């Protein structure tokens, strides 16, 4: 899981995504009263590429999802999958004691649920 500042331009965020081999980034809170945000590859595709915007001229704040739904580390996988389905999301920060400790996605849910049974 990688955190970035919302003032970062999208091109720089993409370079970070490529470097850490992730399709999502956590956007840091500006202060204690702020909420976490998320930037997904799909946000970049919809808000930058599809609208023919220059990624070096668009800030992460302009296209990120915020506030975003969060999950607790102890949430059961099946409930997390239902939450994703109910709210039409594919990724969520995992927050423990007001600190982001990871990111969960449909991809990771499937890997943790089905693949262990196949081994």
Predicted segments with their positions:
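The conserved cystathionine-beta-synthase
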Residues: 3-22, 27-29, 70-88, 95, ...
